[in-house]
Every structure is written in C-alpha cells, then in structure tokens.
Amino acid sequence: MTKVLTDARSIRIKGRSFLALVLSPELPLDWWLGRLDDLASRSAGFFLGRPVVLDVADLEIDRKQLKSLLDELGQRNVRVMGIEGGRPSLFEPGMPPAMKGGRPAPDFEVPEVDPADPPKAGKGKAAAPITPEEVQPVRATASIIVREPVRSGQSVIFPEGDVTVVGSVASGAEIVAGGSVHIYGTLRGRALAGSVGNASARIFCRRLEAELLAIDGVYKTAEDMAPNLRGQSVQLWLEGDSIMAERLN
C-alpha cells in the first residue's frame, strides 16, 4: 500500500560560505611536506581543526600519488575537506569531493628564512608621496568588536572587515580578519590580517608576544620577530613581500 503524506512540510536548504585555507602543493612532494612541517613546528596547532582545500590544478600527479599525499596530510592533522582542480581520473571513492567555483584569494606561503640573517624589524621605508592620480576611492569597512579576552583554542574569523579585541589574545587562540586587526591587550596567539586579499591591512597590538602574524598571506613567526619588538606596543604592515614593524608611542 502506498502511504500518502498529507502533512507536507518543506525542507529548508540554505546556502552559506565559510573560510578555508587552500594548500597548493609543489613537486617534489617530500620537499613541500618538509616546508609544511616547518610551518607547523613554528606555530603549533595551526592546522588542527581547520578546514583545508587542496589545490592540485598545477600538480602533475597520478591517483596513487594523490592518495599518498592525502595520507601524509592526515598524519599531520590537516583535514582536507575538498580537492580543487583535479582531473576526474584522480578521484576514487573515499577521497574528499571535487570542488569548483572557489573565489580567488592570495596564496598562504611559508616564508624562506635564512638562520644566518638577523630578523628584520624597525621602521619601514618612508612612504612615497601620493600623487592625485594614485588616490583611490575608499569604501566603508565593516568591523566587529570583541569585548572580552580570546581564550586558548578559540578563533575569531571575520573575512568581511576589521576585528577589534578589547582584551588579550591567549596563546593558541587566533584572530582572522579580512581587514585590519586591533588588539587592546597582549597578543600571544595568532593574528591574520587581510586574509581575503587586502595588502593594505595592518595589525596593531598593545603588547606583542605573538606566535604567528600574517598580512595578505605573508607570514612571520615568533622566531622571525626582532627581540626588541617583543613586549612592546607595535603596528605591522606589508611592503612588498615583507612584513614591516614599528613601535607605537
């Protein structure tokens, strides 16, 4: 007998977007995994619980190599939620799904650091005068204010604009902003500004003790920071591929 559903109820389906990191492996894979290990060792827990999309569009690998790469990432607690740019022949049951239509954003790359070189710090170069032809219209920037400390393990993610924290950011916590990051307290965790492609974003904090800083995909870890900046009130900004810093009065 066919059962007739008399109380028809619609199923609510919503669209929603989330922020995920995109990893773009390079050959040879052993070398690239070594660089990934280096980043993870300098910022413990960076990938833990964070959704990741694997971009293999420019990678000449076969299915066996892709499966091995996914296994290696899994051993490093890197949770791959999808694969972008892969040929249909690369996929097999049990792999993360193919993804399309991602919005372009800057790559997050591990900076090359020469241990023999002292950390670069201090004031950046004087800004060149802005001519009228270079002036661009300024759009209003969205922002949120967090009125309490951000505890270890917590994340504040706001890709639409600036994030202001009235308090401190503990070690193991992170702030991710599409615009600038303002910390009215001690920054001990991670702060990522300009996360969706904003090279003019800045990071401000009352006391710098950060594990990791990033602006528009350019990273600086605790080991890369100048000792004279630690414990100071600091602002950081991007010049080319370098993060510049200066103390605030």
UniProtKB/Swiss-Prot annotation:
Keyword tags: Cell cycle, Cell division, Plasmid, Septation
Pfam families per UniProt: MinC_C (PF03775)
Record's compositionally biased regions (Low complexity): 119-129
An example Gene Ontology biological process: cell morphogenesis
Region (Disordered): 89-130
Subunit architecture: Interacts with MinD and FtsZ.
Function statement: Cell division inhibitor that blocks the formation of polar Z ring septums. Rapidly oscillates between the poles of the cell to destabilize FtsZ filaments that have formed before they mature into polar Z rings. Prevents FtsZ polymerization.
Assigned protein family: Belongs to the MinC family.
Database matches in HAMAP family: MinC
Stated name of the protein: Probable septum site-determining protein MinC
Organism of derivation: Rhizobium meliloti (strain 1021) (Ensifer meliloti)
